[in-house]
């Protein structure tokens, strides 16, 4: 998940540097969504994974 977030962030930065506003905005939005989903899944696995024997 974080890898995809980083990839979208890099695409957004390159597109912003080249002046493609629409593409940069789309890639930045996708990066934010992937990042938030990754954090949520991490927190769920962190709390659900702690089961006492």
UniProtKB/Swiss-Prot annotation:
It is found in: Cell membrane. Pfam families: DUF1328. Keywords: Cell membrane, Membrane, Transmembrane, Transmembrane helix. Its main location: membrane. GO terms for cellular component: plasma membrane. Coiled coil: none annotated. It is a multi-pass membrane protein. It comes from the Bacteria. Belongs to the UPF0391 family. This is UPF0391 membrane protein CKO_03415. It comes from Citrobacter koseri (strain ATCC BAA-895 / CDC 4225-83 / SGSC4696).
